[in-house]
Amino acid sequence: IAAGKDSDVTQVSLDTIESTTHRALVRHGCRDDIAVHVANAVRVAESNGNRICGLYYLESYCRQLETGRIDGDVDPVVSVDRPGTVRVDGRLGFAQSAFAAAFPHAVASARANGICGLSVEHTHTCTSLGYFTEQFAREGLLGIGATNATPRVAPPGGSRAVLGTNPFAMAVPDGE
């Protein structure tokens, strides 16, 4: 969905948003299978009205693919070093594809051990942290996420920025 001049609003379908995002990422050097995950995250953000984590980010993604700040052709490395923990090294690629590589391992670990800590490392911004925790909830699991980011926000009652703009997210299964 994009606002036009004089308050006219042009409706764009979520399918169009997702396919356009995918094409733009691939055109700027992202591998097809990686672009699928990022385009889906943009679609979900837009469907939730979270425009700042949706199409707003597409230009930045494309620019950073071109400059090499994001590696759009990298395979994340998943490690399961001990029960209840999963790590994925995104190797300076997209957080969405790193998460997708580790997610099945984290779900299996949580089911086998009753809990799992998943660490997604060395990736570009994850944008909406809720995108990731909601995937755990859809699997019937409680998802709690946290990120490290440049401090931009003071906590309630605080006067100094100590949190990033997307520090925490939680998703709970709805029973369906």
Model-found features: residue ranges?
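Active-site cofactor/substrate anionic-group-binding motifs, chiefly glycine-
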Residues: 54-107
